Amino acid sequence: MNWAISNLTGGNRVSRAILVRYSSVPLADATNDGSSTAPQTPTASTPRPSSSHSSLSSTFAATFLHASSRHIPGRAVPRQNANGQNGGKGNASGAGGGAGGGGAGGASGGTGGTGAQAAGQLSLPLDVEETVTCFCRKARRKERDGDQNSTDTKLYLEESVLERKLPEADLKALVDLPAGLDYNEWLASHTLALFEHVNLVYGTISEFCTQSGCADMTGPGNRTYLWFDEKGKKTRVAAPQYIDYVMTFTQKTVSDESIFPTKYANEFPGSFESIARKILRLQFHVIAHLYAAHFREIALLGLHTHLNLTFAHLTALHRRFNLIDEKETDVLRDLEVALRLTDDTGGCQDATSTTSSVHDHSHSGDLQHQSLQQQQQHHNSSSNSTSSAEAFHVNSQSNNGSTSASASVSLIDGDAVAPPICTQPEAGAGCKPAGSSGLLGGILGDLTSGEFGDTTRYCTSAVPQAAAAAGAGVGGTAIGATDAAALNNGAGALHLNFSNNNNNNHNLNHHHHHHHHHGHHGHHHAAQQQQQHSGLIQCNAAGGGGNATGVATGGATAAASSTTTA
């Protein structure tokens, strides 16, 4: 058996790849002068003249197609008779070609009868198995690549690559809204930072993310992401194209002055939070694709810690302000658990740790009670109520008659009486005590809880005017929380820092904001000596007039919380 490769068109790669098996196929060849020769069987040792290449190809094609039609199942095959009817037809056509000039057509017609008789000797002109293998080689290679990627989808859960640079406490402090800072301003800074980090990590492995290797934008668990164009039409695009759309849209959005303002006179639009949610959701899609399809390359480059930290940053921000739908983040929930960003049940770990902290502090109740009595004697406080109070700080403890309550995310009612006047979400405390009056600019914020769920209530702490006047009298020293309890404040205040600077709480130092949106300037009002003081109040409200012990800080802390002058 000999093997030959048919070259039907000369430029068709698929045609050259068809393997033909034959035993003795009579092929007509032509010499340089155009005269026909006797049919010969080509072998590996018989070279073919280059001048007769086209004639040989056409003759072999005719013989190959005629012979192959006899072996295709289900097709009617014309029966050969003794008179050689098929050969006669070939002779008739060959005669016409010979009358025109006696070229290769005549030679083909002259040998038509012999070719028809020799066609019966063709055993199997088309090896189906080899041809199918040739055609499907590329598809099988792609299938093997897909199987390899599917086995590596959980590579990011290996213990050796579960590394990140910051512990949980630092991540929590990273996303907590600073007191006095606008919520949109804080959200804009984190959105810009996450966009830059995701773009940098993807840029390191972008050459591995190709149209052929990543034909679809996929995530863990065979999650597929479709792109929605400006008209809302779903489009199935490759991963590189999808990520290019994401980065282009994000860059165009953050560069828009009307959406991300950088000048003092410009304000954030009312729909800014929804725009930021969309940007963060698209960035999460890119992170999910990096974990699902390119984590091996990222780990080999030693960039897995950076990717884990970026994911932890986005997850902490989402858990703090509830920015992404849970259906989107479910694909990487196992990674959240592995990185200890959340527990298996999806509950709030901070509330549990806060509750245990309250029980631990109850063992030292006698010592704290003595300190409380000393502070009451020093400030002449007369409040001895037995109402319940919520203790969240390490130095906060109620009296012997009060009952400690654990933190709960369902304490705030959506129909609370107190109106929202600040931008700090609060889910672990009441909104406003009944007997409070003379509101300052203090922000009530539970910095020990990171879960808010769907709660969007905003609360403020209340400090009576008498407490503010007492703060002015001591000249910048901190006031203990017992004063607030004695004056019907009703809040377990922590870190009360007051100063005599009167800048209307307008220019707080934005140290946490590296993108200088809305740089505020201080305004002097020296002529008006008001009794209004700026300060940072970070506490948890408590019902009634329960006594709570606060940590008094003075001097440097009070100066740090004061406003700056131009």
Curated annotation (Swiss-Prot):
Keywords from the UniProt entry: Cytoplasm, Metal-binding, Nucleus, Zinc
GO CC terms in record: cell hair; cell periphery; cytoplasm; nucleus; plasma membrane; rhabdomere
Name of encoding gene: Mob2
InterPro entries with a match to the protein in the record: MOB_kinase_act_fam, MOB_kinase_act_sf
Protein name: MOB kinase activator-like 2
Compartment(s) of residence: Cytoplasm; Nucleus
Top-level taxon of origin: Eukaryota
Protein species of origin: Drosophila melanogaster (Fruit fly)
Biased segments, Polar residues type: 394-407
UniProt subunit comment: Interacts with and activates trc, also interacts with wts.
Compositionally biased residues, Gly residues: 85-115
Protein family membership: Belongs to the MOB1/phocein family.
Low complexity composition bias: residue spans: 35-57, 367-388, 498-507
Top-level taxonomy: Eukaryota, Metazoa, Ecdysozoa, Arthropoda, Hexapoda
